[in-house]
Amino acid sequence: MGRDTIADIITSIRNADMDKKGRVRIGYTNIAENIIKILLREGFIENVRKHRESNKYFLVSTLRHRRNRKRPYKTILKRISRPGLRIYSNYQRIPRILGGIGIVILSTSRGIMTDREARLEGIGGEILCYIW
Protein backbone atom coordinates (compact mmCIF):
# COMPACT_ATOMS: atom_id res chain seq x y z
CA MET A 1 0.00 0.00 0.00
CA GLY A 2 1.40 3.40 -0.99
CA ARG A 3 1.51 6.59 0.98
CA ASP A 4 -0.78 9.50 0.28
CA THR A 5 1.60 12.45 0.68
CA ILE A 6 -1.09 15.05 0.02
CA ALA A 7 -3.26 13.64 2.82
CA ASP A 8 -0.18 13.65 5.09
CA ILE A 9 0.40 17.35 4.35
CA ILE A 10 -3.23 18.25 4.99
CA THR A 11 -3.38 16.19 8.19
CA SER A 12 -0.14 17.68 9.53
CA ILE A 13 -1.36 21.24 8.98
CA ARG A 14 -4.82 20.48 10.36
CA ASN A 15 -3.39 18.80 13.50
CA ALA A 16 -0.95 21.66 14.14
CA ASP A 17 -3.82 24.13 13.71
CA MET A 18 -6.07 22.24 16.14
CA ASP A 19 -3.24 21.86 18.67
CA LYS A 20 -2.53 25.62 18.37
CA LYS A 21 1.06 25.04 17.29
CA GLY A 22 2.86 27.75 15.38
CA ARG A 23 5.02 25.45 13.28
CA VAL A 24 4.52 22.24 11.37
CA ARG A 25 7.19 19.90 9.96
CA ILE A 26 6.37 18.07 6.73
CA GLY A 27 8.46 15.48 4.93
CA TYR A 28 9.99 16.90 1.77
CA THR A 29 8.67 15.80 -1.61
CA ASN A 30 8.23 17.77 -4.83
CA ILE A 31 4.45 17.69 -4.38
CA ALA A 32 4.75 18.91 -0.78
CA GLU A 33 7.03 21.75 -1.86
CA ASN A 34 4.61 22.87 -4.59
CA ILE A 35 1.56 22.76 -2.30
CA ILE A 36 3.38 24.63 0.48
CA LYS A 37 4.51 27.29 -2.03
CA ILE A 38 0.88 27.78 -3.07
CA LEU A 39 -0.21 28.08 0.58
CA LEU A 40 2.57 30.62 1.17
CA ARG A 41 1.65 32.63 -1.93
CA GLU A 42 -2.06 32.65 -1.01
CA GLY A 43 -1.33 33.75 2.58
CA PHE A 44 -2.41 30.65 4.49
CA ILE A 45 1.07 30.21 5.99
CA GLU A 46 3.66 32.86 6.88
CA ASN A 47 7.04 31.28 6.31
CA VAL A 48 8.64 28.12 4.97
CA ARG A 49 12.18 26.77 5.13
CA LYS A 50 13.90 23.60 4.05
CA HIS A 51 15.52 21.73 6.95
CA ARG A 52 17.94 18.79 6.80
CA GLU A 53 18.12 16.24 9.58
CA SER A 54 20.20 13.04 9.27
CA ASN A 55 20.10 12.88 5.44
CA LYS A 56 16.34 13.58 5.32
CA TYR A 57 14.82 16.86 4.22
CA PHE A 58 11.80 18.50 5.84
CA LEU A 59 9.76 21.61 5.15
CA VAL A 60 9.21 23.61 8.33
CA SER A 61 6.20 25.91 7.88
CA THR A 62 5.08 28.71 10.19
CA LEU A 63 1.29 28.99 10.34
CA ARG A 64 -0.31 32.41 9.95
CA HIS A 65 -1.44 33.96 13.24
CA ARG A 66 -4.11 36.43 14.21
CA ARG A 67 -3.19 40.03 14.97
CA ASN A 68 -2.91 39.38 18.71
CA ARG A 69 -0.35 36.62 17.82
CA LYS A 70 -1.93 34.21 20.33
CA ARG A 71 -3.31 31.51 18.07
CA PRO A 72 -3.23 30.53 14.40
CA TYR A 73 -6.02 31.28 11.96
CA LYS A 74 -8.49 28.46 11.55
CA THR A 75 -7.64 27.03 8.15
CA ILE A 76 -9.93 24.35 6.75
CA LEU A 77 -8.33 21.90 4.34
CA LYS A 78 -10.30 19.15 2.66
CA ARG A 79 -8.83 16.35 0.52
CA ILE A 80 -10.95 15.73 -2.59
CA SER A 81 -9.22 13.40 -5.03
CA ARG A 82 -7.65 10.41 -3.29
CA PRO A 83 -5.84 7.28 -4.46
CA GLY A 84 -9.03 5.20 -4.42
CA LEU A 85 -11.21 7.80 -6.16
CA ARG A 86 -9.65 10.33 -8.50
CA ILE A 87 -11.68 13.46 -9.27
CA TYR A 88 -10.95 15.34 -12.51
CA SER A 89 -12.40 18.57 -13.86
CA ASN A 90 -12.01 20.69 -16.96
CA TYR A 91 -11.29 24.39 -16.47
CA GLN A 92 -14.94 25.39 -16.96
CA ARG A 93 -16.21 23.13 -14.17
CA ILE A 94 -13.61 23.80 -11.49
CA PRO A 95 -15.69 24.64 -8.39
CA ARG A 96 -15.49 28.04 -6.70
CA ILE A 97 -15.05 27.72 -2.94
CA LEU A 98 -17.09 30.22 -0.92
CA GLY A 99 -17.65 32.35 -4.00
CA GLY A 100 -13.93 32.64 -4.73
CA ILE A 101 -12.66 33.27 -1.19
CA GLY A 102 -11.21 29.78 -0.83
CA ILE A 103 -8.89 28.06 -3.26
CA VAL A 104 -8.85 24.76 -5.10
CA ILE A 105 -5.45 23.14 -5.66
CA LEU A 106 -5.20 21.16 -8.89
CA SER A 107 -2.61 18.90 -10.43
CA THR A 108 -2.45 19.77 -14.12
CA SER A 109 -0.24 18.91 -17.06
CA ARG A 110 1.67 22.13 -16.30
CA GLY A 111 2.22 21.39 -12.61
CA ILE A 112 0.33 22.00 -9.39
CA MET A 113 -1.62 25.27 -9.39
CA THR A 114 -4.66 27.05 -7.97
CA ASP A 115 -8.09 27.20 -9.57
CA ARG A 116 -7.58 30.82 -10.64
CA GLU A 117 -4.34 30.02 -12.47
CA ALA A 118 -5.92 26.99 -14.17
CA ARG A 119 -8.90 29.06 -15.36
CA LEU A 120 -6.58 31.74 -16.76
CA GLU A 121 -4.51 29.15 -18.63
CA GLY A 122 -7.63 27.26 -19.74
CA ILE A 123 -6.57 23.85 -18.45
CA GLY A 124 -8.20 21.37 -16.12
CA GLY A 125 -6.79 18.57 -14.03
CA GLU A 126 -7.11 16.48 -10.91
CA ILE A 127 -8.69 18.33 -7.96
CA LEU A 128 -6.36 17.67 -5.04
CA CYS A 129 -7.90 19.70 -2.20
CA TYR A 130 -10.04 22.65 -1.11
CA ILE A 131 -8.70 25.29 1.27
CA TRP A 132 -10.67 28.08 2.93
From Swiss-Prot:
GO biological process, one term: translation
One GO cellular component term: chloroplast
GO molecular function: rRNA binding; structural constituent of ribosome
Role played: One of the primary rRNA binding proteins, it binds directly to 16S rRNA central domain where it helps coordinate assembly of the platform of the 30S subunit.
The protein's assembly and partners: Part of the 30S ribosomal subunit.
Database matches in HAMAP family: Ribosomal_uS8_B
Protein name as it appears in the record: Small ribosomal subunit protein uS8c
